[in-house]
Amino acid sequence: MNSPAILILADGTRFVGRSIGADGVSVGEVVFNTAMTGYQEILTDPSYRGQIVTMTYPEIGNYGVNPEDVESGRPHLSGFICKENSRVRSNFRSTESLEEYLTSNGIVALEGIDTRMLVRKLRISGAMKGILSTTDLDDTSLVNKAKNSESLVGKDLVQEVMPSEASLWNEELSEWWPVSYTHLRAHETDTD
C-alpha cells in the first residue's frame, strides 16, 4: 500500500499520487461527488457502476467503515479518488479503515492529487473516460487504454448491479438509535 498510483484522463491529463486501495488497473468514467460525509454509501451505491468517483471534500476516511451503512452488498464503482485519506478512524461503529475496505474489495484508489484541479476540469469538460493504475505507469499505454475503454452510454448497468434475488429487510434499529422521542416533547410549548 501507498505505492505510486496514477490517474490518466482520455485527453492525456495526468495525476500522480499514492495508492490507498488494491493494486491493479481500473478504467471508468471519471466523475465527482461533493458530499462531506457518506463515502461508504457512495462506495456501495449501485448508481456509480463503471465510474471512478472523485471526492471533493479534502479529507476522507476519518470515521472508517462499518457493515451497517452500506447501500448494497458490495462496492460497485470502478475506482476511488480523494485528496487525503485519514490515517485515523474515529468512530465507535467502525470495523475497518477506508484503506482496508478498498483493498479487501479490490477497488483501485488514489490519494494525494490536486482534486480541485481535477474537479474543475470535469466541471468544464464534463465526465470523461479515465484510468487508475498502480501497476502500469506508462502514460502512452494508459491514455490508449482510457480512450479505447467501453463507454457507459447505452449500457444496461442495472443488469450488472441487480441482486440475483430479493432480500427482506427485517432488522430492528441499532441499540444506539433512540427508541423514544419523549425527551423531545418536553421542549414543546403550547402556542394556542
Where are each of the predicted segments found?
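Residue-level preference for short coil/turn positions at secondary-structure junctions
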Residues: M1-S3, Y48-R49, H76, W177-S180
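Acidic-leg catalytic submotif of subtilisin-like serine proteases
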Residues: D192
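Feature captures the catalytic cores and cofactor-binding loops of soluble hydro-lyases/lyases
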Residues: T13-S141
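Acidic, glycine-enriched active-site microenvironments
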Residues: N2-D11, F15-V16
